[in-house]
Regions:
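PLP-dependent class I/II
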Residues: 4-222
């Protein structure tokens, strides 16, 4: 979910769990965006039958609690693997500041409901952003299911994703990441973040739309 914007269905996760149990495998589940999903409830891999003793959850505070830069994460794992995780941890990084740990405790309590309010705001932005991106010639964007990224198909522009990103950056001042950075299946995609304000997102799309004739000029030049 963190690379793109999709959320595994219950059916897919159940099948993964069945395979893990059948073949006695561990599942490493990155759930950093678990609280930022839209129109559905997230089910952790650990909740499926037989998975509590074979799931290692990776999570943190930078996404759901806007604690980016404080660099605090955690694992939830079976007791049998904790010694190995501790050995890895103490040889990879050292002490997290005490005040950050206290802040994390308060974040998990979330007494004021800040995270749900943040997700509601992201929901408004993702709907607006996807709708406006679809008005750009050559762009196709399904509404994101989770996180705060838009995964946009740019195949209809007729040029490579890297070239689309270059034009947007140099001529419109808008940054995106070529999808191939996340694997070969992303070669016809670019990824945007919609963690900015609605006004900034709207301005970004307007700028992209103004430079979109460059898609055709670049394709013809080739």
């Amino acid at each position: 979910m963190c690379i793109r914007d999709s959320v595994y269905t219950d059916e897919v996760q159940r099948r993964i769990a069945e395979l893990a149990v059948k073949h006695d495998l561990f599942v490493l589940s990155d759930e950093i965006y678990a609280r930022i999903i839209y129109g559905q409830n997230y089910i952790s891999m650990m909740n499926y039958p037989g998975m509590e003793e074979r799931t290692l959850i990776i999570d943190g505070f930078s996404k759901s609690f806007a604690m980016t830069g404080w660099r605090l994460g955690y694992n939830v794992a079976p007791a049998s693997v904790v010694p190995a995780l501790e050995m890895l941890a103490v040889n990879s990084y050292t002490c997290v500041n005490e005040f950050i740990q206290y802040a994390a405790i308060e974040a998990l309590r979330d007494r004021n409901g800040n995270t749900p309010r943040m997700v509601d705001e992201f929901d408004k932005r993702r709907q607006q952003f996807a709708r406006e991106l679809n008005s750009v010639p050559g762009f196709r964007c399904a509404p994101p299911q989770g996180a705060f990224y838009a995964w946009v198909n740019i195949a209809d522009t007729g040029i490579a994703a890297e070239e689309v990103c270059r034009i947007m950056l140099e001529e419109a001042g808008v940054a995106a990441i070529p999808g191939a950075a996340f694997g070969d299946s992303g070669k016809d995609f670019v990824r945007f973040s919609f963690a900015s304000s609605t006004a900034t997102l709207h301005e970004a799309v307007e700028r992209i739309r103004r430079v979109s004739p460059a898609w055709e000029r670049t394709a013809v030049a080739r």
